[in-house]
Amino acid sequence: MSANDAFTICKTTTGDVWIGTTAGLLKYNRSSDDFTRIAELKSMFTYDILEDFNGNLWFATFSNGVFCYNVRSQKWKNYLSNEKDSASLSYNKVISIYEDSRKCLWFMTLGEGFCRYNPETDNFTRYDMSKGFPSNTIYKMVEDKRGNLWLTTNNGLVCFNPETESKHVYTTANGLLSNQFNFQSGYCDRKGRIYLGSING
């Protein structure tokens, strides 16, 4: 393994293992028990990996936007932020990817909120402080049983209804241990209980 700082691991439905590191993307080779470095993401800090319901792979990078790998066609596509295009990716520092129960893909960024991918038009819808969110730094998204999306930030916790786009913000004033949450610290168990990690627990 050519990079020791592994940040994320994804095992696909076909059994392939992909590893995101601070120095690029690797794919594990079972037959030779070694790794192939993926040229398309060479030297790129790969923060998160997600396999969507179609079997496509999405890769979040720390400064190079999002990459999508179409497994069937074996083609890559890079989505980048464009200041002149409000329907582009909101920011190139993407730290988390989430697919909800409606099969919608969401991308959380470190500085420009989060966005939803629109497959019909191959573009994005942006959500940030200009739309009433408490921060533009979004660490993690988790869905509850009612379809609400819970977003952790560096300035509180947000409960967001993606259908009505209504939201409620929770802070230490509502009993949170801290308004500052941690990267990738969120989980919903089989009973629907949600666990979210902050700097104070």
Predicted regions and their residues:
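Carboxylate-rich, polar loop motifs that coordinate divalent cations or form catalytic acidic clusters
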Residues: 1-201
